[in-house]
């Protein structure tokens, strides 16, 4: 689910949010991106 994406997904310094994005999409959200090195899902 969404919360596990935040914990699991590593967010790099320069927008490497692919892992976060994939995780969020699997959780049923539109996309994911990184804010202060944390994965955030966009519903």
UniProtKB/Swiss-Prot annotation:
Q: Name one GO molecular function term.
A: toxin activity
Q: What does this protein do?
A: Reversibly blocks Kv11/ERG potassium channels.
Question: Tissue range of expression?
Answer: Expressed by the venom gland.
The record's note on its domains? The presence of a 'disulfide through disulfide knot' structurally defines this protein as a knottin. Has the CSalpha/beta fold, which comprises one or two short alpha helices connected to anti-parallel beta-sheets stabilized by three or four disulfide bonds.
Which protein is depicted?
A: Potassium channel toxin gamma-KTx 4.8
Which species? Centruroides elegans
* GO annotation, cellular component aspect: extracellular region
InterPro entries in the cross-refs: Ergtoxin, Scorpion_toxin-like_sf
- Report disulfide bridges, numbered on this chain: 5-23, 11-34, 20-39, 24-41
SUPFAM superfamilies from the UniProt entry: Scorpion toxin-like
Instruction: Print the keywords alphabetically.
Output: Disulfide bond, Ion channel impairing toxin, Knottin, Neurotoxin, Potassium channel impairing toxin, Secreted, Toxin, Voltage-gated potassium channel impairing toxin
Which Pfam family is one of this chain's hits?
Toxin_17
Record's superkingdom? Answer: Eukaryota
Which locations, inside or outside the cell, does it occupy?
Secreted
Lineage, opening ranks: Eukaryota, Metazoa, Ecdysozoa, Arthropoda, Chelicerata
Question: What's the family?
Answer: Belongs to the ergtoxin family. Gamma-KTx 4 subfamily.
